[in-house]
């Protein structure tokens, strides 16, 4: 990889500032899912095993007013990290000042410290000042002064220019990617910049508007783009097909027409749909080919579409999947998503890359996650990367 990584650094005795993505679901101090904490462990362990002092920064949720702060403290995250590492972790309930500086000065080689939620800096004295999320230059400079080197392992925020990623990096002589960031750059960056062919993209989700940039960028690179999910029916409308009460972005129909004209046979739409009388798992539903009848809405791709998609995927060497094929959270309309997820697990000769919450949930539910090459930890970041955009968090990492 052309970027500096944590394994290129001399860490012994160094204060290693680490931007991690510990933005986990938390309610009443209880963590709902610790995947993001677990994902950062290899980099944290590497730093402390090589004699570094790990000083971890992360945001947690959005803070718009003082009352948001208590429920979004990093304390439970530090406790969970301590359990996962099986060693004490120092938690500092502030993001700046003497208490934090003294705690950092007191660290021994191999120690771990978690500072308070970086977004506490977004609200000061009741004012919404956005020092962290607005990349306040003084804040980035201050945080940079607390460490010797900077490791960015938070791909989930790589598409954002914040004080805790870009701000710190711009005040450091060396910024390296952590192992998680390195993996994202290698797999997603590799798929976008230098894929092995045939390269097939599977794009789902509700809105064409969310995926336009990705479709545009991948039309030039992919051999086929398979479309599923709610956005299918904006394309159907663009072809003059009937869509019943299905989801449609009427203001995007002309754009969908342009994409269809440009794509030719590269863009593959579903040929059948599972349709229901209303948006309800228990509503009467059936499978129809082509047009969606009046009084029905399409909520999943049908079995013929699944078979056609599998036929395209079976010879692929690179596959990128982002977005569900239907209303995955309702069992009667989850089949398309689950079938695609299951099939990807059988493609042992291909690089298989999955991103997006529902697609990731599907492969985890099916138990095939470990059979895939890479599951992306970034929602918006992986989408923008697939769009071919320069991500500020990655651009700020030093080149080798």
UniProtKB/Swiss-Prot annotation:
Keywords: ATP-binding, Cytoplasm, Glycolysis, Kinase, Nucleotide-binding, Transferase. GO terms for cellular component: cytosol. It catalyses: (2R)-3-phosphoglycerate + ATP = (2R)-3-phospho-glyceroyl phosphate + ADP. Pfam families: PGK (PF00162). The keyword Cell membrane does not apply. One of its GO terms (biological process) is gluconeogenesis. Its EC number is 2.7.2.3. ATP binds at residues 211, 329, 356-359. The keyword Cytoplasm applies. Pathway: Carbohydrate degradation; glycolysis; pyruvate from D-glyceraldehyde 3-phosphate: step 2/5. It is found in: Cytoplasm. It comes from the Bacteria. One of its GO terms (molecular function) is ADP binding. Its main location: cytoplasm. Substrate binds at residues 21-23, 36, 59-62, 119, 160. Monomer. Belongs to the phosphoglycerate kinase family. HAMAP family: Phosphoglyc_kinase (MF_00145). This is Phosphoglycerate kinase. It comes from Levilactobacillus brevis (strain ATCC 367 / BCRC 12310 / CIP 105137 / JCM 1170 / LMG 11437 / NCIMB 947 / NCTC 947) (Lactobacillus brevis).
